[in-house]
C-alpha cells in the first residue's frame, strides 16, 4: 500500500491520457495535459465525468457513482471533514471586550468656531493679522518669461498624438 502511495507522488511517472490512449504524460504535467486534451477531444470529454475528490480522475459517466464510492482520495476528504467537526465542537469564540473610545471631536462645531478664512485658489490672501504692515498680497509666480503666458486651453489635436502621420 505504501509503495503505491509513493509511486502516485512520483512526478516522473507516466500516466495514460483518458482522452487519447496513445498519450503517455508525466504526472507533473498531467493536469495541464487534461485541460488541453479535453478541448481537443470534446466528443470523448462529453462521455467522461470528473471525480469530485481528484480532478485527475476522468471516469465514464455511467461509472461515476461507483468510482465516488470507491475513490482512494475520498478518505483524505472524509478525514478532513471529521477533523473539522471535532474542532467545531471544541472551538469557542471568545467574546470581544473592545469598546469604542469616547469621541471628543465635533467637526461641525470646529467649522463654526474657525476664525481664519478658508483657502480659495485664485483669490488674494493676506498674511498674519490685519495690520497694514502685514497686508501684503502674495502674487502668483510663474517660470515663464515676461512676454509669455500659459495657454488657457489645450489644442484640439495634440502634435504628438497624430496617429502615426509624419509631418
UniProtKB/Swiss-Prot annotation:
GO terms assigned for molecular function: tRNA binding; zinc ion binding
Family affiliation: Belongs to the UPF0224 (FAM112) family.
Keyword terms, alphabetized: Cytoplasm, Differentiation, Metal-binding, Phosphoprotein, Repeat, Spermatogenesis, Zinc, Zinc-finger
InterPro entries linked: TRM13/UPF0224_CHHC_Znf_dom, UPF0224_FAM112_RNA_Proc, Znf_C2H2_sf
Nucleotide-binding listed as a keyword: no
Residues that bear Phosphoserine: 8
Description of the deletion phenotype: Mutant mice grow normally and appear healthy but males are sterile due to massive germ cell apoptotic death after postnatal day 14 with meiocytes ceasing meiotic progression before the early meitoic phase. There is also increased transcription of LINE-1 and IAP retrotransposons accompanied by demethylation of their promoter regions.
Subcellular location: Cytoplasm
Protein's job: Required for spermatogenesis and is involved in the suppression of retrotransposon transcription in male germ cells.
Origin species: Mus musculus
Cysteines paired by S-S bonds: none
Protein name per Swiss-Prot or TrEMBL: Gametocyte-specific factor 1
Binding site for Zn(2+) 2: 51, 57, 67, 71
Name of encoding gene: Gtsf1
GO CC term (a single one): cytoplasm
Record-level GO BP terms: cell differentiation; piRNA-mediated gene silencing by mRNA destabilization; secondary piRNA processing; spermatogenesis
